């Protein structure tokens, strides 16, 4: 579990120029959280604070009851894996196989087990046919798959995904979101995704909405993303299924919008 209490952050150390203002939130073990917000809302800064890259000027973060500070940073970082928007700087191996192996070596995995673990992880992200390829020559979606496999090899309790689909083409986005959903169903890790991708966000157990450095909403995706006031205040786009629902309401004011929305929601979950 991650507990964030009254966190404030400023890039200038000026408390009158806060990027994050009094953030309070709890991330429960085994849940999938999507963090939404407009550019400059503070969500990406928040992800870097969670991973220990930035230190807040005020407030505290606890991971499984251990305070995130200088003394505990190394211990806590072993529990956290992070995947960035551009994974190129995360690759350390000459091949996909080497990159995954490097993560296993970091956790002192038994060398006799490594080949099978690498094969299993590559299959999990649909990259088993690319183990001998150089990561830098892969497509954007393939690179993100390798980054996910390498982080999974570290076996962290918490994984932070920082805008990992924002630079991908539609096929790449679909593949990566499918992997995230498989991880969500597994429920063994806490997943925190900073995203603009609504197809990704609607699969979360909870959505947290940032605006102007603060949290303005948190809860069930169906309720949050169908609230026009929240959507407008956060300056984010409505998911496609809600746009369909709203359009049909204009065509036929008598139809039951909530019933159709529920049907669309179930269809989305079945096809994801």
Swiss-Prot record:
Enzyme Commission number, as recorded: 7.-.-.-
Keyword Disulfide bond: no
PANTHER family: ENERGY-COUPLING FACTOR TRANSPORTER ATP-BINDING PROTEIN ECFA1 (PTHR43553:SF24), HEAVY METAL TRANSPORTER (PTHR43553)
Localization, UniProt: Cell membrane
Keyword terms, alphabetized: ATP-binding, Cell membrane, Membrane, Nucleotide-binding, Translocase, Transport
Molecular function terms from GO: ATP binding; ATP hydrolysis activity; ATPase-coupled transmembrane transporter activity
InterPro entries: AAA+_ATPase, ABC_transporter-like_ATP-bd, ABC_transporter-like_CS, ABC_transpr_CbiO/EcfA_su, ECF_ABC_transporter_ATP-bd, EcfA_1, P-loop_NTPase
Entry keyword annotation includes Protease: no
Family stated for the protein in its record: Belongs to the ABC transporter superfamily. Energy-coupling factor EcfA family.
Xref: SMART domains: AAA
Ligand binding (ATP): 37-44
Name of this protein: Energy-coupling factor transporter ATP-binding protein EcfA1
Signal peptide (residue range): none
């Amino acid at each position: 579990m991650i507990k964030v209490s009254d966190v404030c952050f400023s890039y200038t150390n000026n408390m009158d120029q806060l990027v994050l203002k009094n953030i309070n939130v709890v991330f429960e073990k085994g849940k999938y959280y999507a963090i939404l917000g407009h550019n400059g809302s503070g969500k990406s800064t928040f992800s870097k604070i969670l991973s220990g890259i930035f230190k807040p000027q005020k407030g505290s973060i606890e991971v499984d009851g251990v305070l995130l500070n200088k003394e505990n940073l190394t211990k806590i970082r072993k529990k956290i894996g992070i995947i960035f928007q551009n994974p190129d700087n995360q690759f350390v191996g000459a091949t996909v196989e080497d990159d995954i192996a490097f993560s296993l070596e970091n956790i002192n995995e038994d060398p006799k087990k490594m080949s099978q673990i690498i094969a299993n992880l590559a299959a999990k992200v649909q990259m088993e046919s690319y183990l001998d390829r150089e990561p830098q020559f892969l497509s954007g979606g393939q690179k993100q798959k390798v980054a996910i496999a390498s982080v999974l090899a570290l076996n962290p309790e918490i994984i932070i995904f920082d805008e990992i689909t924002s630079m991908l083409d539609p096929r790449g986005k679909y593949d990566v979101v499918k992997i995230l959903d498989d991880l969500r169903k597994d429920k063994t890790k806490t997943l925190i995704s900073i995203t603009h991708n609504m197809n990704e966000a609607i699969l979360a157990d909870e959505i947290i909405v940032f605006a102007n450095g603060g949290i303005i909403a948190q809860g069930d995706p169906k309720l949050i993303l169908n609230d026009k006031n929240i959507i407008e205040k956060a300056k984010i786009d409505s998911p496609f299924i809600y746009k369909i629902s709203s359009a049909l309401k204009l065509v036929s004011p008598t139809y039951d919008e909530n019933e159709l929305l529920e049907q669309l929601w179930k269809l989305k979950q079945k096809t994801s």
